[in-house]
């Protein structure tokens, strides 16, 4: 981890890959110096109606720590080669995000690579509901398996495709494994 002194409120997880193989040979997690202010504002706006401990100017260490862990995990995901997954935003039904049983088991999103930072759907009467994302979502675990699990019976990278495609086929109709790429807008 490195801290960058800048007025910008952000973080990033750049990596460098070998162009011949795609192997990631270097990664970094960068926290911009105003990340605490950004996380405070996001969490306050998205959860203060249901979480009294965020209704103050400075969060306690546990509250801010959970937000920093989310950002660190998201940026580490980038260093591992994971892209943003905006398909996760619409994977969970609204009533599930208001359920303590569901959110305690699955968290607030199936992918930390989405920008679903906090459970802003929760209402004051939703007691025990999770307000923060899991350390890793079910999609993230699957994506890491897909990218990194050795396929020992494959003689070449070409031979791995059947197994990789089979894994995708097994999850294609499960909404927790939706993938939605980040849209990019190019100048005209």
Question: Where in this protein do the model-derived segments appear?
Answer:
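Metzincin-family zinc-dependent endopeptidase catalytic domain
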Residues: 1-79, 107-108, 118-121
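Generic structural "secondary-structure junction" signal
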Residues: 3, 19, 31, 84, ...
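Alpha-helix termini
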Residues: 35, 39, 87-90, 94
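Catalytic Zn2+-binding segment of zinc metalloproteases
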Residues: 76-92
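Conserved catalytic/binding loops enriched for acidic/polar residues
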Residues: 89-188
């Amino acid at each position: 981890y490195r801290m960058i002194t800048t007025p910008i409120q952000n973080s990033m997880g750049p990596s460098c890959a070998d162009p011949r193989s795609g192997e990631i040979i270097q990664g970094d997690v960068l926290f911009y110096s105003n990340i605490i202010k950004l996380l405070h504002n996001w969490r306050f706006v998205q959860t203060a109606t249901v979480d009294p401990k965020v209704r103050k100017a400075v969060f306690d260490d546990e509250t801010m720590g959970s937000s920093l862990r989310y950002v660190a995990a998201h940026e580490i995901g980038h260093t591992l080669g994971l892209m943003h997954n905006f398909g996760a935003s619409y994977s969970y039904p609204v009533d599930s995000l208001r359920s303590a049983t569901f959110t305690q088991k699955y968290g607030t999103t199936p992918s930390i690579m989405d920008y679903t930072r906090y459970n802003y759907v929760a209402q004051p009467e939703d007691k025990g509901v999770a307000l923060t994302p899991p350390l890793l979502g079910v999609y993230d675990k699957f994506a890491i398996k897909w990218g990194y699990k050795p396929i020992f019976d494959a003689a070449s990278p070409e031979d791995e495709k059947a197994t990789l495609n089979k894994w995708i086929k097994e999850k294609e109709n499960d909404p927790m494994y939706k993938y939605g790429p980040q849209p990019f807008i190019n100048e005209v």
